[in-house]
Amino acid sequence: MSGSAIATARRAFLGMSHSPLLGLNPVAADDQIAIDKAIAAARAAVHEFAPELIVLLGPDHYNGFFNELMPPFCIGSQATAVGDYLSPAGPLNVAGELAIALADHLMDRHFDIAVSRRMLVDHGFSQALQFLWGDEMDTPPVIPIFMNAVAQPGIARMARCKALGEGVGSFLDQLPLRTLLIGSGGLSHEPPVPTLAHPDPAVRERITVRSTPTEQERELKTERVKAAGLALAHGDSWMKPLNPEWDLQWMDAMASGQLDGLCAMNEASIGAMAGNSAHESKTWLVARSALPANTRLSCPVRAYRAIPSLIAGYGVMFMHH
C-alpha cells in the first residue's frame, strides 16, 4: 500500500521490543544501524498515521508493580514514568476519562480489569514513547495498560490476552479516533529479573513490598544488568540464549493475524524456549487482537535483530488497517 494509505487508516499496530541497555552496552555496528533504521521507520510511519489516541501495553520490572499486589492487567487513569536507565521521567499524557470508560466497557463484557489512579511505569512503557516522540514524551493522549510478565502464577494466558485485545478493539469501534496500539516488550529474552524463588530473603522482600529505590540502588541495578548483557554476548552467562526462530514465528503470527495458534501454545514452553521474560511478547498479542484477526494487514515496517548484549530479541513491526 502507498504511504497515503497509512494516513487514511483508522487503526494501527506497533510491536516494539524494548531494552534498557540501548545506549549503555556496545552493539555491533551493523546491528546498531539496523535498529536505528527500524526505529526511524516506525517513527515516520507513526507520525504519518498521526494517531489521535494511543493504547500502550507494557510490562513493569519491579518499579511500579510489586508482589504484594500484582494484577494480571491494570489500566492507568494517570501515569508517571520513573525514569530508569536512560528513559525519561515524568507524567504521561493520559486520557483519563477514556481510560475509565475503557475499564467500564471491559467490565460490562465480563472482563475484570484493575484500575490504577496513580500508576508508576518504567522503561517498559516510556522507551517506546521516547523513541517515537522524544525525551519530553510529547504524545497524543495515551491509555496505558500494564501487563504482568514477571510474577507467576498471575501472568495472563494467551487466550486471555487475545480476549483483552478484542475487548479494547470493540471499545475503539465506538470512538471516532485514529488509534495506535503499541505492544512494548519481548521478544525472546531472560534478563536477571529476580523471582520469589530467590534464596535471599532481602531480594524477595524488595520485589514484594512497594518501595522507591535510592539513586545508588538504581545505579547498582544498571551496572548489574549491563554486566549480564555483556556476559550473554560473550557466551559465558547462565541466562537462556535468545531464540530468533521463536521470535520470527511470533512476528509471522502478528503479520498473518493467525492468533488462535498462539493461544494453543503451551504456556510453560514460552519460558522454556524463549526465556522467562518472553511473556512480555504478549503485549503484542493484546495490541494486535484489537485489529482484525485472520487478516494479513499492510506491514510497511518489519525488522528484527537478535542482540545478546542488549539481552533482547529486538523486533519492530508496524501495521495498519
From Swiss-Prot:
Group of enzyme by EC: oxidoreductase
GO biological process, one term: 3-phenylpropionate catabolic process
Pathway: Aromatic compound metabolism; 3-phenylpropanoate degradation
Active site: 123 (proton donor), 189 (proton acceptor)
Iron listed as a keyword: yes
This protein's record includes keyword Glycosyltransferase: no
E.C. numbers: 1.13.11.16
Cofactor section: Fe(2+)
Keywords: Aromatic hydrocarbons catabolism, Dioxygenase, Iron, Oxidoreductase
Catalytic activity: 3-(2,3-dihydroxyphenyl)propanoate + O2 = (2Z,4E)-2-hydroxy-6-oxonona-2,4-dienedioate + H(+); (2E)-3-(2,3-dihydroxyphenyl)prop-2-enoate + O2 = (2Z,4E,7E)-2-hydroxy-6-oxonona-2,4,7-trienedioate + H(+)
A Pfam match: LigB
Gene Ontology MF, one: ferrous iron binding
Similarity section: Belongs to the LigB/MhpB extradiol dioxygenase family.
Protein function: Catalyzes the non-heme iron(II)-dependent oxidative cleavage of 2,3-dihydroxyphenylpropionic acid and 2,3-dihydroxicinnamic acid into 2-hydroxy-6-ketononadienedioate and 2-hydroxy-6-ketononatrienedioate, respectively.
Subunit field text: Homotetramer.
UniProt protein name: 2,3-dihydroxyphenylpropionate/2,3-dihydroxicinnamic acid 1,2-dioxygenase
Organism name: Comamonas testosteroni (Pseudomonas testosteroni)
Lineage: Bacteria, Pseudomonadati, Pseudomonadota, Betaproteobacteria, Burkholderiales
Record gene name: mhpB
